[in-house]
A protein has these predicted regions:
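Glycine-rich, flexible N-terminal cofactor/catalytic loop recognition
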Residues: 2-78
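A contiguous loop/helix-start segment that scaffolds small-molecule binding in enzyme catalytic cores
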Residues: 2-21, 98-99, 178-248
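Short glycine-rich anion-binding loops that position phosphate/pyrophosphate groups of nucleotides
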Residues: 27-28, 105-109, 189-190
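Short active-site oxyanion
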Residues: 43-49, 126-130, 182-183
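Conserved helicase motor
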Residues: 76-84, 158-162
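Ordered, amphipathic secondary-structure segments that act as subunit-interaction surfaces
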Residues: 96-114
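Short Gly/Thr/Asp-enriched flexible loops that form oxyanion-binding sites at enzyme active sites
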Residues: 109-125, 199-200
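Class I SAM-dependent methyltransferase SAM-binding "motif I" and its flanking Rossmann-like core
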Residues: 117-175
Length: 248
C-alpha cells in the first residue's frame, strides 16, 4: 500500500521545458555590429551553450557584450567531444527548464555544421526551437548573385580530390543550365584557388559563375560573370571566405 501512495510528480508542478536557441555568429570579426541587439539581449540570459570550439565561442560571446563568468556561471559543451548519440546528453537540461543556445563558428547554426542533429532531436522531443536573426553567407550570396532565387540547392563542400570535384562541377552545371536551378557550394579558404582552377577548366564558357567573398566585411566582393570572362582575370581567393554559385 505504501508503494501505491508514492506517485510521480504531477505534470503541472514540473518545470516547463526550456527552449533551444539557434544563435548566429559573425561571418568575420571585422564587422561585429552585424549581430542585432535583440540577439545580444537574448544570449545574455543564457548560461549553457553547445558550440564547435569553446575558445572561439567564448571570444564571440565577449565580443557581443556577454558578461557572465565562464568559470563559475556558464556551461559550454563542445559538440565533437561527446561521441555518438550526443543529443540526449547535450540537451538533457532542457527538460529541467533550462534554455540552451547553439553557436556556430560562423553565420547561422545547422547549415554546413553538426548542429542540425540537435535540432532534429529537439523536434522529436517536442522541444521548442527558436532561430535568432543573423547573417547567412549563403542567402546573402544568393540574393546578390542575380541568379534564380526561387529554385536553388546548397551542396556544402565539394569533393577534395580534383578529378572528383570536376566531375561534381559538371553535374551541377548540367542542373543549373538545363533546369535553371541555382547551385550553391563552398570551400575552405585555403582550397578556394584550386576549386576555381578546376571550375574554369571544366565548365562551359557561357555558364554563369558567382564568387561572393568576405560577406559583410570591409573587403566584401561579389561578382557574377560568365566562365569565359573569369578566365580573363582569375580571382585570388586564398584565405578568403567564399561562396560559389552556378547559374544557367
Amino acid at each position: 500500500m505504501e508503494e501505491n501512495k508514492q506517485q510521480t510528480q504531477p505534470a503541472s508542478s514540473r518545470p516547463a521545458d526550456g527552449k533551444l536557441y539557434l544563435i548566429p555568429s559573425f561571418l568575420g570579426e571585422d564587422n561585429k555590429s552585424i549581430i542585432p541587439d535583440q540577439v545580444k539581449e537574448m544570449v545574455g540570459t543564457l548560461d549553457e551553450f553547445i558550440v564547435e570550439n569553446a575558445k572561439t565561442a567564448r571570444r564571440y560571446l565577449r565580443a557581443i557584450g556577454f558578461t557572465k563568468n565562464f568559470d563559475t556561471e556558464v556551461v559550454i559543451n563542445e559538440i565533437d567531444k561527446h561521441g555518438e548519440n550526443i543529443a540526449p546528453k547535450l540537451l538533457a537540461n532542457i527538460s529541467k527548464g533550462k534554455n540552451i543556445g547553439i553557436i556556430s563558428e560562423a553565420g547561422n547554426p545547422c547549415i554546413a555544421d553538426p548542429g542540425h542533429e540537435l535540432v532534429r532531436y529537439a523536434h522529436s522531443r517536442g522541444i521548442q526551437v527558436v532561430p535568432l536573426v543573423g547573417p547567412s553567407s549563403i542567402l546573402l550570396a544568393l540574393i546578390a548573385s542575380g541568379m534564380n532565387g526561387q529554385q536553388f540547392t546548397f551542396h556544402g563542400y565539394l569533393p577534395i580530390q580534383s578529378a572528383d570535384r570536376m566531375k561534381k562541377l559538371r553535374q551541377l552545371e548540367e542542373i543549373a543550365r538545363r533546369h535553371n536551378i541555382t547551385q550553391i557550394f563552398m570551400e575552405t579558404p585555403f582550397r578556394n584557388d584550386s576549386l576555381v582552377r578546376d571550375a574554369l577548366q571544366v565548365l562551359d564558357g557561357d555558364t554563369k559563375l558567382c564568387v561572393a567573398c568576405d560577406l559583410t566585411l570591409p573587403t566584401e566582393s561579389i561578382s557574377t560573370k560568365k566562365v569565359s570572362d573569369w578566365k580573363k582575370q582569375v580571382p585570388d581567393l586564398h584565405k578568403r571566405y567564399s561562396i560559389f554559385l552556378l547559374g544557367g
